Amino acid sequence: KNNFLYTIKKMKIFDCTTYYKEDLMLEVRFNILNKYVDRFVVAESTYSHSGEKKKLNFDINKFSKFKKKIIYIKIENEPKNLIYSIKDKSHFEEEANKRMNSIKRINHQRDNLIQGLKEANDEDYIMYSDNDEIPDLSNIDFNNIKNKIIIFKQKLYYYKFNLFFERISWYGTKACKKKNLRTFSWLRDIKSKKYPIYRIDNILSKTKYSNVKIINDGGWHFSQVKTPEDIELKLLNGEQHAEFKRTGKNLEYIRGLVER
């Protein structure tokens, strides 16, 4: 019995996320999860998702209450497999390459979170969320979960903390034990569904699993809970930056969405 209790105590939870300039979301995240999580791992890149060079914005002193738990990962290189422009490519191909490069940068930033797991043991739980996805761990006992993958079904909020978008359930945070973690981009890409065990395609798939536990009431996704200026900055530098520029929408349009 004593050995069992010791094992429970030794199992740690690592909450892992990426960062651009979302101080408000990190503050909310750290406060909600602090009592359940052993380590917060935060990765920031010196490149935006659109490929622009950027300064590092994370200041650990803004989160002094959680300083001892935070592991900060600084990424100063681009992914090696970017697609560079070639003359005479069509506009469509050029746009597709920009989108693909953005995805590669996002995955590169996510996958570098592995640097923050050096003290993690095989039985420790590793959670990944985008920073606006916050799991509710208040009723979760990880020691009783035997599934390989855990997926959190979350409530979606848009623009404001009290603007609940009830028509859509969001499957955001995903978790597994360190021994089962391949990469963080692999964990992120797992389909948010428990597939039947008799499905043959599951055997070959890297994204479809039957050994999955879905956590209902699994937390919150606070999408675009930012100032209009910060929303514009995110859209100009995010995965869909090229599409956003093409729409011709501007700061005033965004401000109208937030304030109406």
Regions found by a protein language model. Name each.
Residues 1-7:
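Short, positively charged and aromatic/hydrophobic N-terminal segments
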Residues 9-35:
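N-proximal low-complexity "stem/linker" segments adjacent to membrane-targeting elements
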Residues 13, 34-48, 67-71:
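Short loop->beta transition adjacent to catalytic acidic/histidine clusters or analogous donor-positioning motifs
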Residues 16, 28, 111, 115, ...:
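Catalytic phosphate/metal-binding cores of nucleic-acid and nucleotide-processing enzymes, i.e., regions
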Residues 26-31, 42-57:
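SAM cofactor-binding core of SAM-dependent methyltransferases
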Residues 48-124:
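Active-site-proximal specificity loops/subdomain of glycosyltransferases
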Residues 122-134:
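Short beta-strand-to-loop acidic/aromatic patch adjacent to the donor-nucleotide binding site
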Residues 133-244:
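Conserved catalytic core of nucleotide-sugar-dependent glycosyltransferases
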